[in-house]
Amino acid sequence: GNFMFNGFEIAEKDYSGLPIGVDVVFQATFAIITTALIAGSFAERIKFSSTLVFMAIWSVVVYAPVCYWVWGGGVLSEKGILDFAGGTVVHINCGIAGLVAAIVVGKRSSDIYTWAPHNLIYTIVGASLLWVGWFGFNAGSAYGANESAGMAMLVTQIATAAAALAWMLVE
């Protein structure tokens, strides 16, 4: 048997022959990225050890139940809520958590640091890494090389192009 999922119902997805370990790593990556997004809302205002404790507790108490509700056949899934690559589970979930965390922790002390101006090269490198990563998340959510994966890649590319154009117009 599979000891990791003993006693749990596994959502009925078309894994297209993917080993369960691949899905575990894929889903764990979603969880890691989600907590990293939240950490930006209180960066440099709490100790690193407190951040790790928060991430561990939040992942179990908040993230895991929401994943089940949306992706695992839970109440939201039964009501017809669709979340292909994490719009609800990742973005809404961590957006709310980040807002609450920022409110609880409070403002940064502006007199401690003098922030250097933004570096355009770092901005482009960071955006490029994020862009490539989202290809993996969005296309990977199709669980195979199929039409859904191709459409996810196309939409990701179009959204990136639109965002880049909007940024150039604003700047």
Model-derived segments and spans:
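Hydrophobic alpha-helical transmembrane bundles of multi-pass membrane proteins
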Residues: G1-E171
